[in-house]
């Protein structure tokens, strides 16, 4: 295949989306199911690996081996409180591998474990394939988005996932920034405008304030809640209906994973319905112990169940405004992103907060981020189209970065919301006389003391010549590149001795070797998936051939046209094959093909003989001649047209 354009991928917590900029506009690409967003789900079964809709659709049957929310694990430590609290809610198992979380599943009868980067890479591979199927070209370059909240290791983990999926990640950009780009193309303005991006998706909530002036974006502030989204609204509905089931039927379904999963699917559907209707019905046959669950819910009740969550979305809005030092009256445009912003109550709360201001809903909220990422991909790969030419992008660091100084104080070198790329240098000294070295501990966070912030990594600068405290000069430099990835170095001015940090694995980093191994494994899994598809196709081919043959010779119009002995031979062989199929569902492709050849050896001569003697098949035989080689029709006009049926 020829080389295709760069794409933009919104790798979401619950759903992902891919877009491409071509023919002067962005096209959001639908998957093989016709959906423009694809669930970020990967499932493992005894026979195959499923990604996307196929994985999500079978989750009720296979909850422990269906993995989602990998984005919540990426770039985190196993003992991270977020990981620990999330694990309680997941039906799949997360294990500790040298301090890093891995997802453990049963796949093809074996226990396998995968890093979150590998799971995310499978979703990215799926998005890459969706784009390739649509474009008819290979896709290698991509811009991938992350929440504004993501720290350094989460960004790096996302980049690693791209590498494992065989993508060249041109840049990692913040989701709100991507939405702003999507928006910037729609509405060109000269004067400076302040934009508030309100992004409420399936799993995360981000509020960002940006300014746009003459096509130049600047992010002023970000705030949000990494744990609020559509799934939380689904959970409230699920709990409501579990309680209702208990009241009506005196039975508790909460311990039955499959029942809860089926209920959750119905709740998600009801929630979507309630964005356009004021009432939704739920009908689940045999939900628990054979009891059918038929009920309904009104929009008002749904709003009441989620009232605190809905209202709570305004707190980060206020925080973002404070950080940007803006009053709400100074916001020119409010942009809705994420499927949950379709909820009328959320739109109303936001509109009322901004004193009745109209909200911008012109961009499909599920697609806005991928849309902007696709534009950014076009810019970075040198698209000369005037639509993208005058667009420039300034991103920011989501959290302040600094080092620990005497007494555990956080000394900030780069303040949060600093435009990146950026580089800051500050000079430090020793704390005690004749101190031989300094420990540089790098933190991110907004608290005054480092113990309340997040340690990114540490390194030592040793070999400082003996000197009284306060004399040595140690220059510390923080350098952040355009992807938000941080390098920290320290130099002793007197000796020129330098050390810099490679933020190591205890930060949730994958080593080069790990990534290379995972790239190879990803290839292997892909090959296995294809082999599985071929196998199923030969199995189905044999299956339908045997059944069609059997149907042909059992046709009541046949007696007298075929020798009893031949008739019996075909029947015996067909039954033998059908029995063999029942016992060998998981045989190899070659075995299915071999069995089909054996069956054809018996059937073809007899059927050919039948045709030649009868001058064509008797009419009314279903579906024409079912088989491998189509023999000549004996020239009789009464016979059906013969076609191959696979």
Curated annotation (Swiss-Prot):
Region ranges (Disordered): 614-646
Q: Which UniProt keywords apply?
A: ATP-binding, Autophagy, Cell membrane, Chaperone, Cytoplasm, Lysosome, Membrane, Nucleotide-binding, Nucleus, Stress response
Q: Give the family this protein belongs to, as stated in its UniProt record.
A: Belongs to the heat shock protein 70 family.
For this chain, one GO molecular function annotation is: ATP-dependent protein folding chaperone
Q: Where this protein primarily resides, as one coarse class?
A: cytoplasm
- The region called Nucleotide-binding domain (NBD) is annotated at 2-386
Q: What is known of its domains?
A: The N-terminal nucleotide binding domain (NBD) (also known as the ATPase domain) is responsible for binding and hydrolyzing ATP. The C-terminal substrate-binding domain (SBD) (also known as peptide-binding domain) binds to the client/substrate proteins. The two domains are allosterically coupled so that, when ATP is bound to the NBD, the SBD binds relatively weakly to clients. When ADP is bound in the NBD, a conformational change enhances the affinity of the SBD for client proteins.
Q: How does it sit in the membrane?
A: Peripheral membrane protein
The positions annotated for binding ADP are 14-15, 202, 268, 271, 275, 339
- The molecule here is called Heat shock cognate 71 kDa protein
Q: Name one Pfam family in it.
A: HSP70
Localization recorded for this chain is: Cytoplasm; Nucleus, Nucleolus; Cell membrane; Lysosome membrane
């Amino acid at each position: 295949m020829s080389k295709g354009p760069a794409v933009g991928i919104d790798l979401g917590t619950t759903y992902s989306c891919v877009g491409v900029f071509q023919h002067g506009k962005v096209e959001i690409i639908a998957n093989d199911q016709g959906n423009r967003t694809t669930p970020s789900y990967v499932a493992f079964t005894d026979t195959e690996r499923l990604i996307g809709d196929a994985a999500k659709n079978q989750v009720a049957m296979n909850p422990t081996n269906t993995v989602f929310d990998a984005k919540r694990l990426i770039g985190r430590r196993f003992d991270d409180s977020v990981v620990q609290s999330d694990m309680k809610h997941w039906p799949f198992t997360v294990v500790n591998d040298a301090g890093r979380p891995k997802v453990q599943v049963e796949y093809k009868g074996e226990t396998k474990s995968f890093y979150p980067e590998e799971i995310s890479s499978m979703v990215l591979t799926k998005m890459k394939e969706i784009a390739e199927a649509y474009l008819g070209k290979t896709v290698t370059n991509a811009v991938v988005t992350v929440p504004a909240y993501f720290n350094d290791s989460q960004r790096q983990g996302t980049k690693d996932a791209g590498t494992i999926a065989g993508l060249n990640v041109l840049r990692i950009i913040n989701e709100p920034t991507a939405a702003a780009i999507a928006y910037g193309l729609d509405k060109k303005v000269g004067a400076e405008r302040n934009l508030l991006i309100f992004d409420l998706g399936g799993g995360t909530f981000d509020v960002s304030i940006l300014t746009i002036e003459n096509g130049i974006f600047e992010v002023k502030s970000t705030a949000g809640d990494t744990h609020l989204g559509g799934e939380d609204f689904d959970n409230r509905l699920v709990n409501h209906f579990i309680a209702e089931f208990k009241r009506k039927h005196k039975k508790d379904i909460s311990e039955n994973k499959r029942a809860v999963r089926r209920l959750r699917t119905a709740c998600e559907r009801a929630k979507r319905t309630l964005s356009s209707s004021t009432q939704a019905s739920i009908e689940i046959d045999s939900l628990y112990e054979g009891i059918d669950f038929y009920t309904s819910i009104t929009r008002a009740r749904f709003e009441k169940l989620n009232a605190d969550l809905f209202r709570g979305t305004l707190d980060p809005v206020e925080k973002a405004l404070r950080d940007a030092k803006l009053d709400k009256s100074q916001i020119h445009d409010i942009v809705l992103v994420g499927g949950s912003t379709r909820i009328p109550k959320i739109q109303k709360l936001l509109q009322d907060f901004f004193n009745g201001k109209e909200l911008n809903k012109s961009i499909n909220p599920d697609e806005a981020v991928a849309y902007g990422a696709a534009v950014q991909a076009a810019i970075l790969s040198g698209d000369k189209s005037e639509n993208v030419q005058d667009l420039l992008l300034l991103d920011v660091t989501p959290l302040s970065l600094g080092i620990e100084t005497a007494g555990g104080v956080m000394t900030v070198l780069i303040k949060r919301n600093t435009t990146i790329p950026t580089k800051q240098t500050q000079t430090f000294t020793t704390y005690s006389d004749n101190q031989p070295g300094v420990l540089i501990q790098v933190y991110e966070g907004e608290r005054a003391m480092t113990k309340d912030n997040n340690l990114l990594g540490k390194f030592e600068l040793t070999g400082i010549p003996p000197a009284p405290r306060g004399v040595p000069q140690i220059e510390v430099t923080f350098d952040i590149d355009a992807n938000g990835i941080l390098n920290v170095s320290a130099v002793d001015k007197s000796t020129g001795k330098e050390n810099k940090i490679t933020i190591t694995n205890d930060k949730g980093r994958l080593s080069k070797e790990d990534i290379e191994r995972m790239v190879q494994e990803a290839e292997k899994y892909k090959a296995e998936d294809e082999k599985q598809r071929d196998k199923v196709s030969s199995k189905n081919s044999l299956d339908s051939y045997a059944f069609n043959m059997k149907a042909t010779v059992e046709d009541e119009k046949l007696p007298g046209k075929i020798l009893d002995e031949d008739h019996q031979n075909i029947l015996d062989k067909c039954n033998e094959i059908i029995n063999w199929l029942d016992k060998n569902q998981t045989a190899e492709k070659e075995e299915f093909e071999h069995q089909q050849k054996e069956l054809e050896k018996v059937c073809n001569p007899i059927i050919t003989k039948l045709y030649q003697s009868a001058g064509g098949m008797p009419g009314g035989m279903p579906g024409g001649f079912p088989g491998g080689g189509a023999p000549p029709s004996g020239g009789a006009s009464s016979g059906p047209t013969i076609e191959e049926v696979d």
